[in-house]
Amino acid sequence: MELFRGVLQVSSNVLDCANDNWWCSLLDLDTSDWEPLTHTNRLMAIYLSSVASKLDFTGGPLAGCLYFFQVECNKFEEGYHIHVVIGGPGLNPRNLTVCVEGLFNNVLYHLVTENVKLKFLPGMTTKGKYFRDGEQFIENYLMKKIPLNVVWCVTNIDGYIDTCISATFRRGACHAKKPRITTAINDTSSDAGESSGTGAEVVPINGKGTKASIKFQTMVNWLCENRVFTEDKWKLVDFNQYTLLSSSHSGSFQIQSALKLAIYKATNLVPTSTFLLHTDFEQVMCIKDNKIVKLLLCQNYDPLLVGQHVLKWIDKKCGKKNTLWFYGPPSTGKTNLAMAIAKSVPVYGMVNWNNENFPFNDVAGKSLVVWDEGIIKSTIVEAAKAILGGQPTRVDQKMRGSVAVPGVPVVITSNGDITFVVSGNTTTTVHAKALKERMVKLNFTVRCSPDMGLLTEADVQQWLTWCNAQSWDHYENWAINYTFDFPGINADALHPDLQTTPIVTDTSISSSGGESSEELSESSFFNLITPGAWNTETPRSSTPIPGTSSGESFVGSSVSSEVVAASWEEAFYTPLADQFRELLVGVDYVWDGVRGLPVCCVQHINNSGGGLGLCPHCINVGAWYNGWKFREFTPDLVRCSCHVGASNPFSVLTCKKCAYLSGLQSFVDYE
């Protein structure tokens, strides 16, 4: 219960108007352990006791109030002042002054001969808010005063009823036990599990509290269970509850307090990984359809290994490797994946370069820090190293001073090398080694399909829940020695749920379409440069359209008006989706030295059954490889469908499609 406090001034003129009822009052005052009351002091004691007696049997807003009244002498002038500490279920800042003045003036009306009224001055802060710390005010100020400074005191608060007029107790050097203010009315304390005995502790014992405190605790736990940490999320989850709380000033304050406690509990008392896991495991069974899994497979990473590392990293169990760095060109899914993970945690912050003086203004008190398009300047390199390494540090905040930042996981996305430290117009690699020791780098090199869309929290929860349910043996073998570059995919260790394209070993099965391996190998490259390969206006079909089986539509021949989809256009989330990137040995293909051609994997080297003729991946890799070799010898012959018959060379030079197809990209960059 909130206890308000204030002061009533009683001048000497009021006592001059005392009538016979006041002077001749027969009210019994127990002064056995108190200084004797004489003259006007006795009048004030009678007046205070009369007010307390009337308050005990009154109704209206003052019904059931807790009160503590103490009258004292003025120091510098004649007269008295009364300290009033009062609170009840019907009292609030709006009616406090009216109720207190009405109570005291109603009693005073029958004790004076003239119409005299007292004015109540409530205790208020500099911002105009009422003090609600009556309990602390009694304990730390009023009860420490002794006679003769105190004339009289009355109260109905358990623990102070007998001690408030005990001079021996007040003169004690310290109290044996802090009295506790009963915060319930009638049977409320027993319902809430509190004891109403004298001398109990202020802090509830064994986690028990009042109905209001238990309700507030339940609200905080509900926010954490439903992953509600912002007002906007609260409105979406339970708009009715939010509206009811927002209808009053105290309810609005309760909303802010509950959200702060829920965020603190989620960031400090509960592992962050619990918010990244799905509660219903049945919804994570079809993991091969997960967008994040497809994205990681596209980027040549094992989704299981990456997911298990993310779970360790988000719980700050990776030691100094406190940072994930997604590095690569634009449109490869870096920021998409980073923001999906960030939106799944309770609360995340971002490094903001709009104000270079306070880039880490939004880092304190967060579960995760997102550093998009990161760049490190010499002025903040030491603070950056501490944050990236998960070490506690202090950062400056705008108009707030410095604030402590504990170890917080960091995810970085960038197109450039963040290990370069920028100082003015110069860059240095002095800190590169120290920065790399704090990061795990994932290279995103393959452009994503425009059909991918944004990754959602459900995708993250499905992916990480599946990873958490699998064996951690593969991850533990790598985690023994953390490396700067995250290890690429290992076909032998890939989980069976992720192997969507099994390798064909039966030599009796021919390639699709009834074509021979030689015809399919020869035509695969020409499908890459077919006139319709760059036609982006025609919608793609889920059914593959057969390409040309020979080079009839190649450069120099007439162009067919029929739009023919290339084989690489049908690829979705595979390394072959970026056909115009030069192949990397050991990443995109393995060289078969015996037969002198590239194959898709080690198992197809020197394959007696002719792996190239049976595996479609080997055919695509061979066509891709031969295409780059062809471009080296004929760099100016290949044109896109729009410029096959173009006579103006500038039209070809400015066409990005022609540049990719003909190998003119290096020439254009040079010029």
From Swiss-Prot:
Polar residues bias (residue ranges): 533-548
Amino acids binding ATP: G328, P329, P330, S331, T332, G333, K334, T335
Principal place of residence: host cell
Motif Nuclear localization signal: where in chain: 177-180
pH dependence: Optimum pH is 7.0-7.5.
GO cellular component: host cell nucleus
UniProt-recorded name of the protein: Initiator protein NS1
Gene: NS1
